[in-house]
A protein has these predicted regions:
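Iron-sulfur cluster-binding electron-transfer modules in prokaryotic oxidoreductases
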Residues: 2-167
Length: 167
């Protein structure tokens, strides 16, 4: 599991619950010691420093398992590994290609499991309406809105998409 800075400092509960869901599904969740993806540095034009962070992060993530999916609940941090380091920082290393190809957003991964018939959908009914705004970081990755599709699998849940282009 790759929590990134967002999941370690700002959205801690999201990271914790993501790990709990994966463990509930029977996964052994490994959380290698890892640092920042360099997104903040990149956003401030410090490309050389950002590249160093990306290189270290890819080494850290590969150190635990070189075959397993890398699940993240941080769209920004996951997007850095999947797209931005390639497209903006112009990085093209074997390590980054490997890590980027194995990185999944948590909702994207769970929806993939559902599509493969591997997600237990024995959900309890809960009558609730949930407002949802797709993060820009996930929109930029072109993955659609897997969180809406997942929540819609729960009996009684109605999801109201904000349909706003940006928060």
């Amino acid at each position: 599991f790759f929590h990134g800075c967002a999941g370690q400092y700002f959205e801690v509960e999201t990271s914790i619950h993501s790990v709990l869901v994966l463990e509930h599904l029977g996964y052994e969740v490994l959380v290698p010691k890892h640092g920042c993806c360099g997104l903040a540095l990149q956003s401030n034009g410090l490309y050389d420093d950002a590249r160093k962070y990306v290189s270290k992060l890819t080494r850290d993530l590969r150190s635990v398992n070189q075959d397993a999916p890398i699940i993240s609940a941080s769209g920004s941090c996951g997007g850095m590994l999947r797209h931005e380091a390639h497209e903006i920082l112009e990085m093209d290393t074997v390590e980054l290609r490997d890590v980027g190809s194995r990185t999944w957003d948590i909702c994207e991964f769970l929806l993939h499991l559902y599509d493969q018939g591997e997600l237990d959908t024995d959900f309890q009914r809960i009558d609730v309406t949930i407002p949802y705004h797709a993060p820009c970081q996930l929109k930029s990755q072109g993955m659609g809105k897997p969180a809406i599709e997942l929540m819609s699998l729960i009996p009684g849940v109605t999801v109201k998409d904000s349909e706003q282009p940006c928060c």
